[in-house]
Structures are given as structure tokens and as C-alpha cells.
Amino acid sequence: MKQILNPLKNSNKIPIWFMRQAGRYLPEYKKVRETTKNFLDFCYDVNKATEVTLQPIRRYGLDAAIIFSDILVLPNALGWEVDFKENIGPVLKQFKSQKDFQYLQRDSNNKLEKVYKIIKKVKEKLPSNTSLIGFAGSPWTVMSYMLEGKGKRDFRTSKKFIYENKILAKDLLNFITEKTSDYLINQVKSGVDLLKIFDSWSGVLAEDDFTEFVIEPTKKIILKVKEVFVKTPIITFPKGAGLLYEKFIEEVPIDILAVDQMVPLEKMKEWSNKVIIQGNLDPVILLTNKEIIKEKTYKILQAMKGKNFIFNLGHGILPETHPENVEFLTQYVRLYEQKNSNSTF
């Protein structure tokens, strides 16, 4: 069995992979990326997206590959205007009123077929003991990008919109939820072993709104996927949820909970009795030196020893990260597995 699908309590094997493990910090990624000007075209290029998905597996021997794509591929495939500007990031047409639904299609216009082809091609080339992760953005996070027109930190436009336009906001949320469910189901049909739902902006919502716009749509997606693929594990990542992580665990039928670096280790240990926990080394640690990486990693590994646990970061690998530090971290986790001791090394 592929280890990442079965990170069992008391197992000596600690599954390890990283968010944004394929990306700008890798020289081999940059070499491929330079060949395509437009980022979305790059995401839809079957050969190039396949290659960069496999690069960190070749380099580090990680337990899982995650399909190279972006959470905004889905709205783009549904007809929404999405662009990526250099040194700015994603720029989208703003959703402002009911009439904007005319720009959203019920059909993905065959663009998503390219994603499914990438999955199939990666699957053919991936080592048999390496799991393949598919993903999508959560409805709230995708919706907030559409409402803001770009990524922001306070999301006041999005929150103002959902307060003032409750029915329209729910219509948009439900549309994205339905399409996200279909998208993830088709990813499993194409060959992924498990799924991840990225909710990058869940932490900006108060409790009632968190329930309505994060918990409820996530539940709907999971239940719909599980109707078709009951055994496919699903990772959820309501980043920045803080105290609401516990409400999320209680109300969402999750298999694996990814947590950010702000979550205390004691909470991770406690929650691992209910779900598999994934996390949560601060990505900034990988910008430091080997001694600091070793110290911080050891603390997490000791706390989660014998627990239902997947080692990962609290967010994605940063672009300025040295690949050698990622290599060191991976080897250190492997060494910890071998030693499986309380002593430092």
C-alpha cells in the first residue's frame, strides 16, 4: 500500500511531501517555466505540467506528488477572466452582480480535460510507491478571488459582498461548490490517489460566516466525492482557522487535516486522535540553516511520534528557498524514521 494513504499510528514510516514542492525555488522548474510566457498556458500544457510535477519526486524521493496546477484554473475553465501578472499575481474580472453569471459556463469548455490528461501522464511516469494528489481551491477561497479581483489580505470587498448580497453570495458559492465537486471527482477518475481542498482565506471569516462559507460547502464536496469514491482520502486545509479548526474537525467528515504553523503542537497531538494531521513546519525555517531546520523539525517529529501524522509545511515552499535545505529536511525526517529514538542526533 502506498504509505501516504496509510499513515498509521505507531508506523515507523512518516509520510512526507510539501506544498508547492514543484515551483520557482527549483532551477529545473525555472528552466521549463521560461519556455511559456503565460502562467495559465503553462498549467494547461500537458508535457510541461507533467515534467514539473515529477521534478521534486526525482530530486527528493518524496512520498507524494501533487499535480502542478492552480486553484484558479477552475474558474478560468468555466469562462471567468483570470490572468497572472508578473510581480502582481492573479488578476480577475470582479464578480459584482447577478448579471455576471452570464460569464460563467455550466461546461468547462474542455480546458479541464488538459488537467485530466496531465494526471494520467504523471500517473504513468510516477514510481508505483508514490501517491498522486489532486486538488482544488475551496469554494470560499475561489469565490473571494472572484469578488476581490485579486488576492488581498483583509478581503473587505468579499466580506462586504456576502453581508449585503446574501442570496446572490449563496448562489455563487453553490455554483462553485457544485463545479468543484465535479472537478475533484474527475481527478480521481483520471488517476489521483487522494485529494486536497485548499482554503487559503478561511481565516478571514467570523464564526457564523466560517460555518456558512467554509464548513458547509466543504462538507458538500466531501460527501459528493465520497458517494462515488468512498475510499479516496481527502485532505482539507482551512488555513488560518485558529480556534475554528476544532469546529471544523467536529462538523466536517475529513480524513486528513492540514494545519498551518500557528497551530500548537499540543493541539496537533490532541486532534490526531480523531483525524490524520498534516503539517506544520513554518516555511520560513527553510530559509535559515541546517541547525535551525533540524531543531524545529525534531520538535515536531517528537511531538507527533506514534501519531496519525504526515510531515509537511504550514504553507507552501517559498520561492527564495534553497533546494539543498529541502533535501536536508527530507533526509532528516528519513533519518528520524530509522533511528526512531528519543535521543537527539
UniProtKB/Swiss-Prot annotation:
Keyword terms: Cytoplasm, Decarboxylase, Lyase, Porphyrin biosynthesis
Main location: cytoplasm
Compartments, record wording: Cytoplasm
GO BP field: protoporphyrinogen IX biosynthetic process
Annotated residues for binding of substrate: 20-24, 39, 70, 145, 200, 315
Annotated metabolic or biological route of this protein: Porphyrin-containing compound metabolism; protoporphyrin-IX biosynthesis; coproporphyrinogen-III from 5-aminolevulinate: step 4/4
GO molecular function, one term: uroporphyrinogen decarboxylase activity
Keyword Lyase in annotation: yes
A Pfam family per the record: URO-D
Signal peptide start-end: none
EC number(s) on file: 4.1.1.37
Source taxon at top rank: Bacteria
Site (Transition state stabilizer): 70
UniProt family annotation: Belongs to the uroporphyrinogen decarboxylase family.
Subunit architecture: Homodimer.
Role: Catalyzes the decarboxylation of four acetate groups of uroporphyrinogen-III to yield coproporphyrinogen-III.
Entry protein name: Uroporphyrinogen decarboxylase
Originating species: Rickettsia prowazekii (strain Madrid E)
Lineage of origin: Bacteria, Pseudomonadati, Pseudomonadota, Alphaproteobacteria, Rickettsiales
Protein encoded by which gene: hemE
